Amino acid sequence: MKQYTTPEQTAKLIELGFERPKNTVYTQVAKRNIGYGIVEWEDAGEEGSYSIGELIEMLPDYINGNFVNWEIHTTRGDVKWSVGWDCFETGQFQWIRRTELVNALYEMILKLKEEGVI
């Protein structure tokens, strides 16, 4: 089972205003050795990804003063994970089903962010 978001998913969440993942590290790579053991460094940028736990922490406990019901289910067949939440507009549960839990949570966060819930 995948435990972390992809670099593309991570970049999208950061772009949407979420804090950088806790396991983000700033790295530098050696560009060239300029002699006498001195190395010139070049910034390689930031790496990191969100864990399943960090994605769950992004989800709100309350929407408009109402406690939010979140559900995570395992399913049979090719689609292994199903995440759902109360939709106060329709009064029904909405579901996202994916083979990886991290992908289902990521898509749920995008949907809620798009709707202005988080």
Question: PLM features: residue spans?
Answer:
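Ampiphathic alpha-helical segments that act as solvent-exposed interaction surfaces
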Residues: 94-118
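Short amphipathic alpha-helical segments that mediate assembly, nucleic-acid/protein binding
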Residues: 7-9, 52, 102-105
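Extreme N-terminal leader/activation tails
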Residues: 1-33
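Non-transmembrane alpha-helical segments in soluble domains
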Residues: 10-14, 60, 109
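N-terminal segment of the canonical double-stranded RNA-binding domain
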Residues: 19, 29-99
